Amino acid sequence: MKICRKIILLVLTISVLFVFSCKTNEKKNSAAQANGDLSKYELVAEAATKQCPVMLDEITRLDSVQYKGKENALIYNYSIINVKKSDLPANATDLAAGMMRDTMLSKLKGQAALDMFRKDKVKLVYVFKDMEGKDLFVFDFKHTEY
């Protein structure tokens, strides 16, 4: 029962936290304009990472944001600070991952703030690690999905 409660809390937390993670679209400055469109995403990632680590709720921390130019991807790195992957049953993890992905995708679709990302075909990647640094979930969304 305790594990199910943690999973439900994790799903709800993820749903709330990613609303905050997508608020990183900033205006280009003159240096970014001189370097082209791709550097604006490097600036977005740097600006977001400077504010990290940020506790989004009692168990979720945004650790960093990266931009991978070759993949044209913004990667949001999170830690779930009181969950160990080894404590979660595999079937519960798979179920939670499916629910979280669906919830995240539906919330991404409703965000006008992501129009610039869609236009520039940026892939959004959300990486969640447990308290030991092991991958719990990785969600990636192509611009055509969100």
PLM region spans:
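Bacterial N-terminal signal peptides that target proteins for export
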Residues: 1-9
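Bacterial signal peptide processing site
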Residues: 23-26
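C-terminal motif of bacterial Sec signal peptides marking the signal peptidase cleavage site
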Residues: 18-21
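Short edge beta-strands and adjacent turn/loop segments
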Residues: 56-82
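Short, non-transmembrane amphipathic alpha-helical segments
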Residues: 86-114
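Short, low-complexity, Pro/Ser/Thr/Gly-rich segments in the mature regions of secreted, periplasmic
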Residues: 133-146
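A short amphipathic beta-strand at an alpha->beta junction
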Residues: 104-136
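Post-signal peptide N-terminal segment of mature Sec-exported envelope proteins
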Residues: 31-51
